[in-house]
């Protein structure tokens, strides 16, 4: 490797810049301690692995052909003697899409052969939280392309420092500011990003959910929400049963309806139009969800009711229900700016101004970091709910998340499942692996582990 430079042939010159991880490849390639050749533990064989000798630091060098054959023979031996699921594949990490990454090929190989894949249980708080509201994972709940920032009138950079962590994206933020956008940085530290902000908001570490909920409180109290967006593109008008907290469905009354629809026992905004995301029902399936028809003063199906009520409590065939929007408003009523000030150390009047900027100086985008605090999934839910009630999602200049659509996560399904869903791999959480190795069981059933195929992690 002589030099690292960006792809000069891409159609969008603004995306030619390289991230820090890309620049680090030369150091990784020429690192003194890098393993450069295939190695096998000296006493190891497929039939007799001699696990007691692990840690002995005694190795035998193999040729690449020998190594490939050994892996193939081991996979075959394990499949024939212990079942395909005994081969575990871990093919995901920060290097998954770089020069040394193998996420696509490794997971595709596991899926085709019915091996077990390990879910690495990434502690991306905002990713999991946003996904609880919008549905889906990598493929849906992320912000627009970075070049879209210039269309945002307000850009929140929340607990991340792009000049250091994502310098290839930072210029988009500066260009948005130069175009007239409000550049708001929320961060406990006066970072490089904060030094360039229109407004810097220091906050007590770990208290971001309280700030977000107070912003929701202000938006709701001042009626700065987007009523049409709430009614047409979120779960706000859906009726929630008081007895079990689930959405009311026509099948609750013995009527025919789609089977096995997912439950969403939370008060946030489910974007019904995201029907192609991993966990969100299709538009046809949502016919099972029930709303209150404000014109007919009776219950109706979500896809057949032109004017569903956003607020109110009702009784449907003896079942007491409340709209999801009413529940959200009631839940946020206690989260006043004064309440949040005591927790976050952000002045109440600053919180009101943040809410006004986000809801009124729209379209607005939230550019977030990974958020690794143990309460950050709540922050992700809060961001998504902020976006949903103000209509700041799915539009030019309006989105949420830490990975943009200019990243390679979009539409990777054909690569992971080249033959469709035939031979789909088992999947277990990484956090359960120790217990599986110790007990040989998973969820109370026998689960042998004979091989861990680790790529880029």
Question: Residue locations for each model-derived region?
Answer:
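N-terminal export/assembly segments and adjacent metallocofactor-ligating motifs
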Residues: 1-309, 320-321, 338-339, 347, ...
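Alpha-helical packing segments of well-folded alpha/beta enzyme cores
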Residues: 67-74, 328, 336, 350-354, ...
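A glycine-rich, hydrophobic/aromatic-adjacent loop/helix-cap motif
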Residues: 86, 338, 349, 354, ...
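A generic alpha-helix surface/boundary motif
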Residues: 103-104, 334-335, 381
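Generic structural signal for hydrophobic core residues of well-folded globular domains
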Residues: 113, 219, 332, 358, ...
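Conserved, charged catalytic cores of large soluble enzymes
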Residues: 318-319, 326-337, 406
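Active-site-adjacent helical/loop segments in soluble small-molecule enzymes
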Residues: 342
């Amino acid at each position: 490797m002589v030099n690292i430079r960006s792809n000069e042939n891409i159609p969008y010159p603004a995306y030619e810049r390289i991230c820090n991880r890309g620049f680090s490849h030369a150091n990784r390639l020429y690192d003194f301690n890098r393993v450069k050749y295939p190695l096998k533990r000296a006493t190891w064989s497929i039939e007799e692995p001699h696990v007691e000798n692990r840690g002995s630091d005694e190795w035998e060098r193999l040729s690449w052909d020998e190594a490939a054959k050994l892996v193939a023979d081991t996979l075959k031996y394990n499949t024939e003697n212990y079942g395909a699921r005994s081969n575990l594949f871990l093919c995901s990490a920060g290097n998954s899409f770089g020069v040394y990454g193998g996420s696509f090929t490794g997971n595709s190989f596991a899926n085709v052969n019915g091996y077990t894949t390990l879910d690495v249980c990434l502690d991306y708080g905002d990713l999991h939280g946003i996904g609880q509201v919008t549905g889906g994972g990598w493929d849906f709940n992320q912000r627009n392309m970075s070049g879209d920032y210039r269309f945002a009138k307000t850009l929140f950079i929340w607990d991340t420092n792009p000049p250091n962590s994502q310098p290839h994206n930072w210029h988009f933020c500066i260009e948005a500011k130069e175009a007239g956008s409000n550049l708001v940085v929320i961060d406990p530290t006066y970072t490089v990003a904060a030094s360039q902000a229109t407004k810097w908001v220091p906050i007590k570490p770990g208290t971001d959910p309280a700030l977000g909920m107070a912003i929701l409180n202000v938006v709701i109290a001042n009626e700065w929400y987007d009523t049409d967006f709430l009614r047409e593109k979120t779960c706000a008008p859906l009726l929630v049963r008081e007895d079990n907290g689930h959405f009311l469905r026509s099948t609750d009354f013995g009527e025919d309806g789609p089977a096995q629809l997912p439950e969403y026992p939370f008060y946030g905004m489910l974007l019904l139009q995201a029907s192609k995301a991993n966990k969100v029902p299709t538009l046809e399936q949502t016919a099972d969800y029930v709303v209150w028809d404000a014109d007919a003063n009776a219950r109706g199906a979500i896809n057949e009711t032109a004017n569903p009520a956003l607020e109110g409590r009702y009784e449907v065939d003896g079942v007491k229900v409340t709209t999801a929007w009413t529940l959200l408003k009631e839940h946020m009523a206690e989260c006043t700016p004064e309440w949040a000030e005591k927790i976050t150390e952000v002045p109440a009047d600053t919180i009101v101004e943040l809410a006004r900027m986000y809801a009124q100086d729209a379209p607005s985008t939230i550019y977030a970091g990974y958020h690794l605090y143990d309460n950050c999934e709540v922050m992700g839910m809060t961001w998504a709910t902020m976006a949903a009630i103000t209509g700041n999602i799915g539009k030019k200049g309006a989105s949420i998340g830490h990975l943009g659509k200019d990243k390679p996560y979009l539409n990777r399904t054909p690569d992971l499942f080249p033959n469709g869903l035939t031979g789909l791999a088992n999947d277990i959480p990484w956090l359960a692996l120790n217990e599986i190795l110790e007990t040989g069981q998973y969820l109370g059933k026998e689960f042998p582990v004979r091989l861990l195929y680790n790529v880029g992690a």
